[in-house]
Every structure is written in structure tokens, then in C-alpha cells.
Regions:
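C-terminal helical subdomain
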Residues: 184, 203-240
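Conserved glycine-rich cofactor-binding loop
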Residues: 18-20
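Conserved NAD(P)H cofactor-binding loop of Rossmann-fold oxidoreductase domains
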Residues: 92-97
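Active-site helix of classical SDR
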Residues: 124, 160
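Residue(s) in the substrate-gating loop at a strand-loop-helix junction
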Residues: 144
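Substrate-binding pocket helix/loop in short-chain dehydrogenase/reductase
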Residues: 100-101, 108-111
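Conserved glycine-rich Rossmann-like NAD(P)H-binding loop of the short-chain dehydrogenase/reductase
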Residues: 32-49
């Protein structure tokens, strides 16, 4: 079965829509005719994006400016989505830290787990019954190539993405024959307009990066085909292969030394 066609009533939800892959997903969905619900903390950026999508593509773009790492803010959104006709859910919001986990802020590390893993679980479970009942829907989960292997100096992020990677591909197996597509996006470095990338960008060769727009189009095309996993970019493909076949005791110190440099 194909994904539900866009209608006046249904919506495509994008979390982390204020920047990067999230913004690109929202733009690509609007280009394909979907009205959206845009979710992120920065309401000013969401409002600018919503206005642009409406003006350029004639779609409705709703804004939900909330912190998905906060359970009290997340719960009303999950309740709302459970009652709405959600055609597509893009669980994209995520954040990372670099450095030895014992030296990082425990509260922020916990927030990473809430945002990268628990929020993905909560929002997916909110929309899933409706999608199954309608026998149609698509769930795109942004995991990471980092979730395929142990990564010292990126421990919390890698662990959170190991959850999303496994959850996405396990869920896809459960939904066979139910009309609901599930695709895992496992990207490596993605070039955006975010100035926070400047320092990281100097340590990663230009040829390794892919653009957010390319990633978004590739991901939504893969979701339409109900592809299990989409892996854009050379480094993410290499990390996927290494995570499956290389001895973990060998890859961990090699990858960890690189991530140590990212942590300064």
C-alpha cells in the first residue's frame, strides 16, 4: 500500500522542525501537498517556517512550540496527535553531546534520552492506533549511523540512537500487512545552515557531508516505498557496515578517538 494522500483534514507531523533535517522534511512534505504540524522549542523559527510553507505551497502549517524532552509538555501533544488524522509522523528531533559522559551534565544527558528515545516512543504510540485503524500511515524515525556501534565520547547519544534504530526496524516487522510504513533514517553528517556546526565542520571533510534537502527527499521517497532503512552519505554507509561486521572491541576506540576531538 502507498502512503495516505494529503487531504484537508490529515496532517504530517515533523519534530525538530526548526532547523536542519526537520526544516527540510517540512519543506519537502509541503512540496508534496501535505499540511503539517511543526514541533520544536523555538516558536519564532517555527512561525517563520509555517508562513513560508503556507505562502509557497498553499498548505496549512500548525505550530507547536514545546520542549519534547519535558514530559509535561510532551503529554498534551501526544494526546492531541492520538485524536488527529495523522498521515505521516517524522520523529526527527534529537540532540547530541561529545566527551566523557562522567564529565557531562547529568540532567542534560537525561534530557537527551527523553528527547532522542522516550519522546520517539511516546509520539509513535500516540499515532499508531489511528494509523492501524485507517490502514494507512507512515512513520519516519531519525536514528543514526552512531546507533550501530559503541562510541566512546558520544555514549548517551549513541545509546539513544541504538534504541531508535532497533525500535524502528522492530516496529516495521510488527506492522507488516497493516498498511503502515516505517522507515529508519540513519544519517551521518548533514550540512545545514546552523552556525553551531562550524567547529564540527572543520574536522569533517567536505566530501563526507550531505545536504538536509537531499536527506529529506531520499527519506520520504524511502518511506513511500516502505524501505526498512535509508542511509544517506558515505560516512553513514561506512559506519553501518562497520557496525554490522567489524569487531566492536576494535571499532570502539577508533571511532571514540575521533569523537573525542569533536568534544574539544
Amino acid at each position: 500500500m502507498s502512503l495516505p494522500a494529503p487531504t484537508a483534514e490529515n496532517r504530517a507531523v515533523v519534530t525538530g522542525a526548526s532547523s536542519g533535517i526537520g526544516t527540510a522534511l517540512a519543506e519537502e512534505l509541503a512540496r508534496r501537498g501535505y499540511s503539517t504540524i511543526l514541533v520544536a522549542r523555538r516558536g519564532d523559527l517555527l512561525n517563520e517556517l509555517a508562513q513560508r510553507l503556507t505562502e509557497q505551497y498553499g498548505v496549512t502549517a500548525e505550530v507547536r512550540a514545546i520542549d519534547l524532552s519535558d514530559r509535561e509538555q510532551r503529554a498534551p501533544l501526544a494526546a492531541e496527535l492520538a485524536e488527529r488524522d495523522i498521515a505521516i509522523l517524522c520523529n526527527n528531533a534529537g540532540v547530541a553531546t561529545f566527551g566523557p559522559v562522567a564529565e557531562l551534565d547529568p540532567d542534560f544527558e537525561r534530557a537527551i534520552m527523553e528527547l532522542n528515545a522516550v519522546a520517539v516512543h511516546d509520539l509513535t504510540l500516540a499515532v499508531l492506533p489511528g494509523m492501524i485503524a485507517r490502514r494507512g500511515g507512515g512513520i519516519l524515525i531519525t536514528g543514526s549511523a552512531a546507533g550501530n556501534m559503541p562510541i566512546p565520547n558520544n555514549a548517551t547519544y549513541a545509546a539513544s540512537k541504538a534504541f531508535t534504530n532497533s525500535f524502528s526496524e522492530s516496529l516495521r516487522g510488527e506492522l507488516t500487512g497493516k498498511g503502515v510504513h516505517v522507515t529508519l533514517l540513519a544519517p551521518g553528517p548533514v550540512r545545514t545552515d546552523n552556525p553551531d556546526q562550524d567547529e564540527v565542520g572543520t574536522k569533517i571533510p567536505d566530501f563526507i557531508w550531505v545536504t538536509a534537502a537531499y536527506t529529506a527527499k531520499l527519506s520520504l521517497d524511502a518511506l513511500a516505498r516502505n524501505k526498512m532503512r535509508v542511509v544517506p552519505g558515505l560516512i553513514s554507509k561506512g559506519m553501518s557496515v562497520a557496525g554490522q561486521y567489524a569487531p566492536r572491541a576494535l571499532t570502539a576506540p577508533i571511532v571514540g578517538s575521533f569523537y573525542k576531538k569533536l568534544g574539544g
